[in-house]
Design a protein with these regions (language model features):
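Acidic, contiguous N-terminal accessory segments
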Residues: 1-82, 125-138
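Feature activates predominantly on carbohydrate-active enzymes
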Residues: 16, 24-27, 31, 71-203
Length: 203
């Protein structure tokens, strides 16, 4: 992806692109830039022709038609993701809610060694001006859709931290560009009154 602080790779997003697709692209550009010192430009598909590659393809780009995921029948759901490489391109795709962002951070953490341990503490971003690696082809769908950490501290209120660690912040407002906030019931606690209204069931 980079050679002595420079790169030939461009981050490609579809037109139109969703908020999570743009967020995944922007975060990849930021952290890959910090890691390598290179500038990873984000471009949007336009017209019939693609700009020159090689690409890091994010989301449902037209490039996928020529380089499909080599794991047929994969169901990524809303939060799942897939990562694979097909020379010379790298592909990250995922579900429409949080999946594509989860894929971007899976690459940064599991393939490239980045870490975000605790809010307020500097992240661990390896310094790799020359960045060569072989990504593991994979598709993953979280077993649990509700992945909130019930630990009341800065973690509970930090949407960025939860995004980078592929969870949902306990009480933070999660922007639509981050995939929003899943709601399975009216609130996190004190729900019986709403789920089983006394006026209906105990009148």
């Amino acid at each position: 992806l980079a050679d002595t602080g420079t790169t030939t790779y461009t981050i490609l997003v579809p037109r139109p692109s969703s908020g999570p697709e743009r967020k995944a692209a922007e975060d990849l550009a930021e952290w890959l830039g910090q890691m390598t010192g290179a500038t990873f430009t984000i471009v949007t598909e336009s017209g019939a022709d693609l700009p020159e590659g090689p690409f890091i393809s994010i989301g449902q780009t037209r490039l996928l038609k020529d380089y499909p995921l080599p794991l047929p029948g994969t169901d990524l759901g809303r939060d799942g993701y897939a990562i694979w490489a097909s020379d010379p391109h790298l592909f990250i795709t995922g579900g429409k809610r949080r999946g594509i962002i989860n894929g971007a951070y899976s690459l940064l953490q599991e393939d490239l060694g980045c870490r975000w341990y605790i809010p307020g503490v500097d992240p661990v971003i390896p310094h790799r001006p020359t960045l060569t690696f072989r990504p593991v082809t994979r598709a993953y769908r979280p077993i649990f859709e509700d992945r909130r950490d019930p630990y009341y501290s800065d973690v509970a209120y930090d949407a960025d931290w939860s995004l980078r660690n592929r969870t949902y912040a306990l009480t933070a407002t999660v922007p639509a560009a981050y995939g929003g906030y899943p709601r399975f019931w009216p609130s996190f606690v004190h729900t019986y009154d709403a789920l089983v209204p006394p006026s209906k069931y105990f009148a």
